Regions:
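Preference for the N-terminal adenyl/adenosyl cofactor-binding alpha/beta module
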Residues: 1-184
C-alpha cells in the first residue's frame, strides 16, 4: 500500500502492478512524478528498479538498527524515525555520507554509533546515476493510512488521516520486531 503497488491476477497468474486507485503520495507515484518532471523514463520497470534499490537499503538498515539497539541496550540509537531522518535528503545522506564512509571520513557526527558498512548496497547505483536519487523525491508527499493498518494510536485504535509517506514507512517498519532471532 505504501509502495503504491497491488497484486492482480492475469490469466491465473499473480502479478504486481501499480495500484488501480493510486495514492498520490505513495512511493510509486512519487517516483513516477519525479521521473516525469526530470524527463526520465518513468515506465513500470524503471520505477520498480528504483523502489527495490531503496527499499532494500531501508530494510537492511532496519535490521542493522535493531541489532545496534539490542547490542548497546540503548533505544535512543534508533535512527529510522522522523526525529532523526525527517526527509529523503537526510536518508540519502545516511546512505552515502554515513554508511559508505569510515567514521574518520564522515563530516556528520550525529550517527557515530552506526558502523561503516563496506557494502556495494551503499554505493550510488547506476540506475540512480541515470535517473533519480532518493533525495529528489517530494518530502511533502502524504498518504492516507491504510484502512486496515496495523499502526495504532495512543488509544490502541487504528490510525487514520494523512501522514508523510516516509514517516508512514518508518512507523510501519517499527510495528515489526526486526531484532528477534527466531526459533530453531
Amino acid at each position: 500500500y505504501i509502495l503504491g503497488l497491488e497484486e492482480v491476477k492475469d490469466k491465473g497468474k499473480k502479478l504486481i502492478s501499480s495500484a488501480q486507485n493510486p495514492q498520490l503520495g505513495s512511493l510509486y507515484e512519487n517516483i513516477a512524478s519525479k521521473l516525469n518532471q526530470y524527463s526520465k523514463p518513468n515506465d513500470f520497470e524503471s520505477i520498480i528498479k528504483l523502489m527495490i534499490i531503496w527499499i532494500n537499503r531501508i530494510l537492511f538498515l532496519k535490521l542493522l538498527e535493531s541489532q545496534i539497539v539490542k547490542w548497546n541496550a540503548k533505544p535512543e540509537y534508533k535512527f529510522l524515525n522522523p526525529t532523526k531522518i525527517n526527509d529523503f535528503d537526510k536518508l540519502e545522506m545516511l546512505f552515502f555520507e554515513i554508511l559508505a564512509k569510515k567514521q574518520n571520513d564522515r563530516h556528520h557526527r550525529e550517527f557515530d554509533y552506526i558502523p561503516y558498512l563496506n557494502s556495494s548496497l551503499f554505493e550510488l547505483h547506476e540506475m540512480e546515476e541515470k535517473s533519480l536519487k532518493i533525495s529528489n523525491l517530494a518530502d511533502d508527499a502524504h498518504i492516507e493510512y491504510y484502512a486496515k493498518t496495523i499502526i495504532k494510536d495512543e488509544n490502541l485504535k487504528r490510525k487514520t488521516g494523512e501522514v508523510c509517506t516516509l514517516h508512514y514507512l518508518f512507523e510501519f517498519l517499527d510495528a515489526y520486531d526486526f531484532s528477534s532471532e527466531g526459533s530453531e
